[in-house]
């Protein structure tokens, strides 16, 4: 049930995996949760009603993109991001920091914040911890992120430590700027690259700030999966058990299964939507590339057992035709399929944890991927 305050409850455990609920005034988020990415106020190639019907309880908006276009103040005048974009449930916004570090031009970073030029028109902006929280407040998101500095991996240890310590100081400033908002939350972001002692230092310091939730950032940025999982094994035991844990920017279905097993509750990634726009489908059989000629005369659907019309009601031959022809409907149908599969996976994960059968579910799911797609006709 919805509540006036922000709250998190663990309902079941299976090893380190947790099944629970995040309660907010705008709705309940069932965890483990996958958040479709609505970068600029839209989950690309999807209607918001479709996203909801697939089982998503929460979506993500991107502070950097929204502050540049249409502008946070304009969104506020139009009633906030929920009203503006037609999504009535909870919304999480990132701080904009990752995009500033990776997309923006001519960055200048110091203790106060970061100045940069828009990748769209070259206009100069300044992002500080206080301004990031102000923008997220104008967007009226339900869960907000601290501003942090995310370094690309591999990174020299000295630079990684400097960025981590700066992010901790920025977390303190974000906490002050956020203040007391009972129905909302600000999450701190654990940084430290691929260095265990830095991750420990970051997690311990953020834990001491007694925030409402905790994110793990700076992973899934090109490092091997084993490194990401090693860092989760360092961080998750430190973070409070009664607070939600969010792994930012992750990831593949396999990443999700292995991260849930280490105690992560929330995920987001552009992968299912981006892959759909490039002809790639996620299914119970693993990844299926609809560009391949083997599908050109295949009358079978992607997955006859799926509840999603895109997966069940359209032939592989038709999807292949749409993708090869560059038709917009191809991107729409494959994005629909992919988000349906991700939510199907999360639903299965939650049920398996509740039943104490998460390891069995993981084994069955990975065996399905390993068997591969149905044989070609």
UniProtKB/Swiss-Prot annotation:
Keywords: Glycosyltransferase, Queuosine biosynthesis, Transferase, tRNA processing
Record bears the keyword Glycosyltransferase: yes
Molecular function as annotated in GO: tRNA-guanosine(34) queuine transglycosylase activity
Residue stretches spanning the membrane: none
A GO BP annotation: queuosine biosynthetic process
Catalyzed reactions: 7-aminomethyl-7-carbaguanine + guanosine(34) in tRNA = 7-aminomethyl-7-carbaguanosine(34) in tRNA + guanine
Recorded family membership: Belongs to the queuine tRNA-ribosyltransferase family.
Record function comment: Catalyzes the base-exchange of a guanine (G) residue with the queuine precursor 7-aminomethyl-7-deazaguanine (PreQ1) at position 34 (anticodon wobble position) in tRNAs with GU(N) anticodons (tRNA-Asp, -Asn, -His and -Tyr). Catalysis occurs through a double-displacement mechanism. The nucleophile active site attacks the C1' of nucleotide 34 to detach the guanine base from the RNA, forming a covalent enzyme-RNA intermediate. The proton acceptor active site deprotonates the incoming PreQ1, allowing a nucleophilic attack on the C1' of the ribose to form the product.
Protein name, as recorded: Queuine tRNA-ribosyltransferase
Organism: Brucella melitensis biotype 1 (strain ATCC 23456 / CCUG 17765 / NCTC 10094 / 16M)
């Amino acid at each position: 049930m919805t509540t006036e305050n922000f709250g998190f409850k663990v309902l079941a455990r299976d090893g380190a995996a947790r099944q629970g609920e995040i309660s907010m005034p705008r709705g309940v988020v069932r965890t483990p949760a996958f958040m479709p990415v609505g970068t600029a106020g839209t989950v690309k190639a999807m209607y918001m009603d479709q996203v909801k019907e697939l089982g998503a309880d929460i979506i993500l908006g991107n502070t950097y993109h929204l502050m540049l276009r249409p502008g946070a103040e304009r969104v506020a005048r139009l009633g906030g991001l929920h009203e503006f974009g037609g999504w009535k449930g909870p919304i999480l916004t990132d701080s904009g920091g990752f995009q500033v570090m990776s997309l923006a031009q001519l960055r200048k970073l110091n203790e106060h914040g970061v100045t940069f030029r828009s990748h769209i028109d070259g206009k100069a902006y300044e992002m500080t911890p206080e301004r990031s929280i102000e923008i997220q407040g104008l967007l009226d998101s339900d869960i907000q992120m601290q501003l942090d500095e995310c370094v690309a991996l591999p990174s020299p240890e000295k630079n990684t430590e400097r960025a981590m310590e700066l992010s901790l100081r920025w977390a303190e400033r974000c906490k002050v700027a956020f203040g007391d908002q009972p129905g909302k939350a600000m999450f701190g972001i654990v940084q430290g690259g691929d260095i265990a002692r830095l991750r420990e230092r970051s997690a311990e310091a953020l834990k001491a700030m007694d925030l409402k939730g905790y994110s793990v950032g700076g992973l899934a940025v090109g490092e091997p999966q084993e490194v990401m999982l090693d860092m989760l094994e360092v961080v998750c035991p430190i973070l409070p058990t009664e607070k939600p844990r969010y792994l930012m920017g992750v990831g593949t279905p396999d990443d999700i299964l292995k991260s849930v097993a280490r105690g992560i509750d929330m995920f987001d990634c552009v992968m299912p939507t981006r892959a759909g726009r490039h002809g790639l489908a996620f299914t119970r059989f693993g990844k299926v590339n609809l560009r391949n000629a083997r599908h050109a005369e295949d009358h079978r659907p992607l997955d006859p057992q799926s509840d999603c019309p895109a997966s069940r009601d359209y032939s592989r031959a038709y999807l292949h035709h749409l993708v090869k022809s560059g038709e917009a409907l191809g991107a729409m149908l494959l994005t629909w399929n992919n988000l349906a599969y991700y939510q199907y996976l999360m639903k299965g994960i939650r049920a398996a944890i509740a039943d104490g059968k998460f390891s069995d579910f993981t084994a069955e799911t990975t065996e399905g991927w390993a068997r591969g797609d149905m044989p070609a006709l």
